[in-house]
């Protein structure tokens, strides 16, 4: 392949390599994909006519008009590999082959997605007894299948699963997915949207390979499943952005959830910038579910040109307040979620200062699509069990932030695979400022927490107070605990730290210099462990 083709392929993926590890401003990023996928309702029981009917329904239901453009064919289309290793589709389910179905989808003005497996055998072969899924994965056929999927058949998206690669071959995730993506880049003349499906956040390497990645096990149409996935994604906002997204899995709208649960499901997927892939039968979707899926004001949060994921700023009474900028970075308009995962009504009282806003503030309920009364001090709502208020909030002025939570940081060596004996992780702690800390920080120069957008209106000298949790006495390294705090490359070391955990949250204070605008602050310890980190605050020195 010529280099010109390689440059065209995966340009969106390459965009985020630098910016996720260090600050950079962008004016526009490619938003999460929107469409329909076959797996939730049909699993491997798909065929050519079924896919065409769903594509037709996408148009007839008007979903394409609000942004749903992908028709993704998941597991179940495989037939076999012949003696030359060439992949064939299922002769009964797809008698006219996959190029014909991709062409049909394209003829409707839509985009076509396909599925494969990083190993040899598909998830359908393991979990659904599909013998046609044996030996049809990408393992050993990376270049050949990539050419078939994208150049011969013409697909625009691929989801790459990990059942055969992980459960059978025990391959290492980063190495295996890098091998596959490199093969696609070598043969692909187009920008393919790629999804990595490892059922847990796989590591910070993923943003250089994929546009989206799964962060949890498969969804199902139950409140417990929706709640579980939201919980998994609450503290992953720093790992999304610049056209790369945490995938909360396909939507279960229209598959039996209660109305308030559907509103929470769709609203949280939107404000957290997950891909929006409908998973129900579009020819039989309830009217209320269809109306929700076509809510342009919620969709606008998901497709916002900033491409940000909402993050937690307040946690009380077991409810969560999440916020993100929309329309303009550090502007006066923000999206807010008041999320109640509990079995009781939750009363939210959110000071405007928590949202970094002040002055008369206008509020719009995006689910109900109606304006609420303006406020000048705090936002207050009662939210029913399993419910969520999704709000557009517009203040008069934007305030300079003073508190940065540990759980909002980019953790350079974080993953959720559970393979590391002592990997950096999120750890609940009741008296922490947000009820959450990060643990197993430090011990290596690369095992740090970093805040890439610490903002100062004017710059100057600040008092920085770091709150932390003293180590347990049983931990042998307790006397060696230290914090190395680097501000725009300038390091301050705090090594005389509290060692009595019974005293609760401790703190250490020093002065730092911030530049006007955005600053990068990194906390860790190169040669010893750091204590569990709660947050830090910044106060200008007058």
Please provide the spans of the model-predicted regions:
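Catalytic cores of secreted or luminal carbohydrate-active enzymes
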Residues: 267-313, 385-412
């Amino acid at each position: 392949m010529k280099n010109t083709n390689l440059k065209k392929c995966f340009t969106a993926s390459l965009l985020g390599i630098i910016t996720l590890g260090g600050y950079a401003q962008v004016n526009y990023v490619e938003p999460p994909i929107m469409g329909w996928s076959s797996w939730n309702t049909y699993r491997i029981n798909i065929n050519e006519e079924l896919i065409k009917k769903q594509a037709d329904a996408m148009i007839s239901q008007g979903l394409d008009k609000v942004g749903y453009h992908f028709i993704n064919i998941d597991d179940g289309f495989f037939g076999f590999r012949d003696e030359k290793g060439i992949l064939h589709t299922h002769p009964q389910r797809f008698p006219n082959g996959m190029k014909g179905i991709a062409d049909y989808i394209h003829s409707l003005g839509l985009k076509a997605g396909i599925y494969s497996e990083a190993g040899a055998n598909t998830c359908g072969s393991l979990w659904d007894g599909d013998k046609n899924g044996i030996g049809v994965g990408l393992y050993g056929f990376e270049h050949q299948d990539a050419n078939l999927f994208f150049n011969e058949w013409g697909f625009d998206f691929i989801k790459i699963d990990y059942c055969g690669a992980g459960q059978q071959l025990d391959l290492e995730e980063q190495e295996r997915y890098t091998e596959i993506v490199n093969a696609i880049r070598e043969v692909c003349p187009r920008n393919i949207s790629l999804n990595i499906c490892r059922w847990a956040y796989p590591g910070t390497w993923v943003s250089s390979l994929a546009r989206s990645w799964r962060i949890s096990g498969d969804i199902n149409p139950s409140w417990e499943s929706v709640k579980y996935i939201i919980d998994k994604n609450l503290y992953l906002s720093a790992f999304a952005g610049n056209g790369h997204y945490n995938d909360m899995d396909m939507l279960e709208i229209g598959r039996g959830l209660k109305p308030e649960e559907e509103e929470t499901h769709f609203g949280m997927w939107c404000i957290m910038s997950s891909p929006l892939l409908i998973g129900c039968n579009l020819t039989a979707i309830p009217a209320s579910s269809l109306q929700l899926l076509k809510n342009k004001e919620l969709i606008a949060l998901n497709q916002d040109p900033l491409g940000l994921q909402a993050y937690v700023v307040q946690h009380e009474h077991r409810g969560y307040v999440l916020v993100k900028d929309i329309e303009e970075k550090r502007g006066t308009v923000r999206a807010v979620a008041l999320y109640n995962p509990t079995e009781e009504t939750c009363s939210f009282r959110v000071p405007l200062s928590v949202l970094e806003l002040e002055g008369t503030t206008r509020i719009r309920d995006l689910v109900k699509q109606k304006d609420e009364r303006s406020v000048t001090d705090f936002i207050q709502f009662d939210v029913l069990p399993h419910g969520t208020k999704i709000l557009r909030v517009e203040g008069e002025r934007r305030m300079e932030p003073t508190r940065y939570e540990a759980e909002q940081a980019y953790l350079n060596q974080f993953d959720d695979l559970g393979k590391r004996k002592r990997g950096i992780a999120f750890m609940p702690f009741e008296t922490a400022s947000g009820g959450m800390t990060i643990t197993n920080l430090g011990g290596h120069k690369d095992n740090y927490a970093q805040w890439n957008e610490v903002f100062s209106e004017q710059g100057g000298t600040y008092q920085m107070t770091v709150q932390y949790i003293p180590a347990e006495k049983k931990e042998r390294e307790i006397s060696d605990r230290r914090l190395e705090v680097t501000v725009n490359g300038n390091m301050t070391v705090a090594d005389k730290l509290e060692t009595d955990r019974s005293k609760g949250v401790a703190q250490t204070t020093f002065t730092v210099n911030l530049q006007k605008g955005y600053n990068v602050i990194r906390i860790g310890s190169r040669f010893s462990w750091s204590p569990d980190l709660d947050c830090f605050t910044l106060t200008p020195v007058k």
